[in-house]
Amino acid sequence: MLKSAITGWGKCTPDNIMTNDDLSKFVDTSDEWIQQRTGVKERRFSHVNTSDMAEIAGKHAIACAGLNPEDIDVVILATCTPDSIVPSAAAHVQKKIGAVNASVYDVNAACAGFLYALEQGKAFVESSLYKRALVIGAEHITWLLDWSDRNTAVLFGDGAGAVVIEESKNESDGEIYSFSNGLSSDNLEILEIPNFGSAMDRFNPDEAARVRWTFDGQEIFKSGVRAMAQASAEAIEKSGLSKEDIDIFIPHQANIRIVEALEKKLGLPNATTIKKVHRYGNTSAASIPTAFVD
């Protein structure tokens, strides 16, 4: 049976840095308030579209793998902030990087999106359906923010990260072992953008012009830590490894309280936990690949 490996990686973090002090000039907040609750010190704001950031990250990943864009067989872009609904953001990326031989599509699973896309890329390569997959997580999430809501406005940032997946030739290739993805649909309402999509009231100008967030921070903390700890433990078990074997742990960079609670609950005695939320904020589907590249 074929095994897959990550052979290239790249990222795009916008140059426009927005510090907490910068943000407090137009949001009812302060540096102290933000850091105490989220651990975020700064985040990146993009002046270009999601596909533009994905293009840069993707090109870096392809070059890192020693490939050309024409070598890519499938582009999977994880995002909840696509440039457009039709065509997909992945279609824009295909055109911009010149991956003329690739099938392309978007995956929308919000913060978990990159892991879903990575699992699909692994399955494609290991089934021999495709030889080389470019998997990208990219978000222009600041475009969606409600600046009157400091609970969400202070937390998020923009960015993109990408990896190339190919057949693993040997154990030193960075083989992809196992996944544990899933969803509990019992509490969908704790984090929603309910009026963005076909549920939007297009005939109410005030409603249609505003992107509203439903954000229950306490429930997100409790369910997020519990679910990520369970999924991480299951993935380790599926791989045949033990918790003691793990050297580096790269969780979703939700906020520092969630990351540190997850680190404690999971209990990886020999692992270094990568923490980048202070630099980039929560970049949703881009958080894991950008932290991986950093």
Task: State where each predicted segment sits.
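Condensing-enzyme catalytic core mediating Claisen C-C bond formation in acyl metabolism
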Residues: 1-47, 149-222, 226, 230
